[in-house]
Amino acid sequence: MVFMKVLCLIDGLGSGGAQRQLVGLASLLKKEGYDVLVVYYHGDHFFVPFLKEKGVAYRYVGGANRVDEKFIKVFKTIKSFGPDAVISYMGGANMLACLIRLAGRRFHLIVSERSLTQRLDLKTRLKFFLYRFSDYVVPNSHAESDFIARNIPALRKKLVTITNFVDLDRFYPDYTLFREEKILRLLCVASVRRVKNTLGLISAVKRVIDEGYAIRVDWFGDSLEDDYYQDCLQSVEKFHLQDVFYFHASMADIAGEYRKVDLFCMPSLYEGFPNVLCEAMACGLPVIASNVSDNAYIMGKDNEEFLFDPCSVEDMAACIIRFQKLSLEKRLQIGRTNRESALQKFSRENFVSQYIRLIK
C-alpha cells in the first residue's frame, strides 16, 4: 500500500500550543504510515527535539524576512517534496500555502485556524479571502467555526471543526497526591500578557486572602509583554503577595506540575482552544476558567459553576472560594469526572482520524 506524502507547514516551532498540536499531528500521521515533512521558516526550534525523537523529517527554511522571500523558499521546498496534501497552521503559514497553490502547485490543502478572531480588519479579510483556495478550513474551536460561518458565508461549506488532542499517556492523574490542606495550591500555565488576564487573577487572589482563605499561586509562562509583566510584579508587591503569587519560566515537561496542585485556573479574557485546560482535566485536576470561547464546552455541564466572568474580580474570587469550601472527597470526584471527560473528548486517535478523513 502506497501512503500519501503530507507536508505540515507552520511559521515556527516555538513552545506554543499550536506548535505542540502541529508536531503531534505530524508524529501521529507518521505512525499511521504517511510520509511526513514539517516545514517552518522562523527561528524558533523548541519542538525540534520532539520531532527527532519521533523520527519525523523537518526542514527549516529560514533567512527570509520579506513575504516574497518566504514565498520563494517555501514554494521550492513544496515543489521538491511533492506532497499530496499540505496541512498549514497559523495565519501567516495558511496564507503562504494558499498563495503557493494559486501559483500552480497541485496539492490537497487544509488550513487550520488556531485562534479566536476578534475583528475583521483588512489583513483578516485578506486571509479569509485566500482561504477560498483551500479544500478545507479547520478551526480548532467551535467558537471560531461559528464566527467564520456567520461572517464569511463563502467558507461555510469548507468548515470542519477539529478540536485539540491531549497526550493522555503523558497527562494522567495521581490521586494519591490530593490532600486536604489549609492552603489551596492553584496553578496557571500561560504566557504573561494582557489577554491572559494575569492582573485580574492577582486582584482576585488578594480578595480571596482578604476573605480569610489561604492560597498559593504558581504561574508558569514566559513574559511576552515586558511592561505588563512589570505591572504584575508591582501589583504582587503592592498587595503583599510575594509569598503567595510565584512566577516561573515556561517548561517543556509541565505534566508533573499539574499533579502537584489542587486547582487549575484559566483567567483569560479570550482564548482559541486552550491546550492547557484540556491537559489539566486529563491529569484529573479540578479546573476553573473564564466563560469565553470553548471553555464551557471543554469543561462540560458538570463544571458550569466553575466558570466566571474574567472582567469581574469579584466573580473570579467567588469561584475560587466556592471551590476552596469543597471537601477533599468532592474535589476527587470532580477530578475523576474531568479525567473521564478528557478521555472522551481529547484522544489522539480521534484527532488524527479526523485529519486523515480530510486528506483522503
Regions found by a protein language model. Name each.
Residues 16-27, 191-210, 217, 227-230, ...:
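A conserved mid-protein helix/loop that constitutes part of the nucleotide-sugar donor-binding site
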Residues 38-45, 189, 216-230:
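Glycosyltransferase donor-sugar binding loop
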Residues 66, 146-150, 163-182:
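Acidic anion/phosphate-binding donor-loop and adjacent secondary structure
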Residues 88-95, 113:
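Short His-centered aromatic/hydrophobic patch
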Residues 301-313, 322-328:
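Conserved acidic donor-binding segment of nucleotide-sugar-dependent glycosyltransferases
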Residues 230-249:
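Nucleotide-activated donor-binding/catalytic signature segment of Leloir-type glycosyltransferases, i.e.
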Residues 250, 269:
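Aromatic "clamp/platform" in nucleotide-sugar-dependent glycosyltransferases that forms part
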Residues 286-289:
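Short hydrophobic beta-strand element within catalytic cores of glycosyltransferases
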